[in-house]
């Protein structure tokens, strides 16, 4: 993809990767900004944070002992870093702080680059998701990035995404379809496919409490860390289908009424027919192959849910994760999401009702 461009979705309410959803327009997603050194988003990924921490450790080791010990940075969990930050000796905490500060500066530079895109020029708020967000170090990095941006004249608010990363990519699926598809039901099946994990779950609406679906939550979650097993594509699809069939039984056992809908969040640029144009390189096997269509495979495996034909819709995973924040984005017109994970997922939205006004 050329510099400063992003995927432009198709304008069809029930198409995969659609630009027009019931409450928002998806203006752009999966922007792949490049420099001579590589993708801009790689400067604000989980690997980037680990590389920054490694660099600080190497510098300190030249002067004496590493306060973090001998454990490789990639093996130090977010919980361990959080504990070091709060309870570690001053030098260990200072090293973690240094990594957070440098990462925040890099993240701010990445966001400034995104703000130069025409689709992003009016953004008022950015929600930040992904695995790093689910930690105190991630929250501090987001907060520090927000301060850096405002200090440099950018009136953009940054907020950590509300839901846990394992849940946000599932909950967002309830906003992929018009409300009439969900009417008379209390839950859906949702799938979140990532470079390391595949998640499937039952998302319960709780719409009697909150009509805007802000009380929606994950009733049941199945998670498989496929990166540990390195499966073939067909094995991964079959495992996912097993998850979904088990979840249908679980919903019935728990007295839930599933809507005839499966929502999918998947990395990459999603064509209107449900195939993946590009961006699936971290998935198990070749998901961009001609003739492979995940929504079609799931429809064949679950042709009906209850008494109705199954509707399956797939969109980019960052888009779906961002949609989980929709109930809390009603006071702004233009907003965006960035997900810090294997790479940097991204999407920009416009609230349709506010834009019309």
Model-flagged regions — what are they?
Residues 2, 7-69, 73, 173-174, ...:
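Gly/Thr-rich phosphate-binding beta-strand-loop-beta motif of the actin/hexokinase/Hsp70
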Residues 134-164, 224-238, 261, 270-335, ...:
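Glycine-rich phosphate-binding loop and adjoining helix at the ATP-binding site
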Residues 174-178, 185-262, 267, 295:
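Conserved small-residue-rich
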Residues 64, 114-122, 149-153, 178-183, ...:
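Alpha-helix termini
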Residues 70-122, 160-166, 223-258:
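Adenine-nucleotide phosphate-binding core of ATP-dependent small-molecule kinases
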Residues 123, 184-187, 258, 308-310, ...:
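Short coil/turn connectors at secondary-structure junctions
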Residues 48-62, 76-89, 128-131, 194, ...:
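Short loop/turn segments at strand-loop or loop-helix junctions that form parts
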Residues 100, 106, 118-148, 268-270:
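Glycine-rich phosphate-binding loops at beta-strand->alpha-helix junctions
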């Amino acid at each position: 993809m050329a510099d400063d461009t992003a995927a432009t979705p198709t304008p069809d309410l029930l198409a995969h990767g659609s630009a027009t959803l019931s409450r928002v327009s998806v203006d752009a997603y999966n922007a792949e900004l490049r420099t001579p050194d590589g993708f801009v988003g790689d400067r604000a990924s989980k690997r980037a944070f680990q590389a920054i921490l490694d660099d600080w450790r190497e510098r300190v080791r030249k002067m004496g002992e590493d306060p973090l010990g001998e454990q490789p940075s990639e093996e130090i969990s977010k919980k361990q870093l959080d504990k070091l930050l709060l309870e570690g000796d001053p030098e260990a905490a200072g090293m973690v702080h240094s990594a957070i500060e440098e990462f925040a500066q890099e993240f701010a530079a990445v966001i400034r680059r995104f703000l130069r895109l025409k689709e992003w020029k009016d953004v008022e708020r950015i929600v930040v998701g992904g695995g790093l967000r689910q930690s105190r170090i991630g929250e501090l990095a987001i907060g520090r990035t927000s301060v850096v941006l405002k200090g440099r004249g950018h009136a953009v608010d940054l907020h950590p995404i509300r839901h846990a990363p394992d849940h946000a990519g599932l909950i967002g699926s309830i906003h992929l379809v018009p409300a009439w598809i969900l009417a008379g039901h209390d839950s859906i099946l949702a799938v979140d496919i990532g470079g390391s994990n595949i998640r499937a779950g039952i998302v319960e609406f709780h719409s009697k409490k909150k009509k805007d679906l802000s009380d929606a939550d994950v009733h049941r979650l199945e998670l498989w860390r496929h990166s540990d097993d390195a499966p073939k594509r067909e094995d991964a699809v079959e495992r996912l289908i097993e998850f979904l069939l088990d979840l249908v039984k679980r919903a019935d056992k728990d007295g839930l009424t599933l809507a005839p809908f499966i929502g999918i969040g998947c990395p990459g640029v999603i064509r209107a027919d449900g195939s993946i144009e590009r961006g699936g390189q971290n998935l198990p096997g070749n998901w961009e192959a001609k003739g492979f269509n995940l929504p079609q495979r799931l429809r064949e495996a679950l042709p009906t849910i209850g008494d109705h034909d199954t509707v399956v819709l797939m969109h980019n995973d960052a888009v779906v994760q961002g949609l989980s924040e929709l109930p809390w984005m009603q006071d702004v017109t233009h907003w965006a999401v960035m997900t810090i994970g294997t790479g940097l997922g991204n999407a920009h939205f416009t609230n349709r009702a506010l834009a019309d006004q």
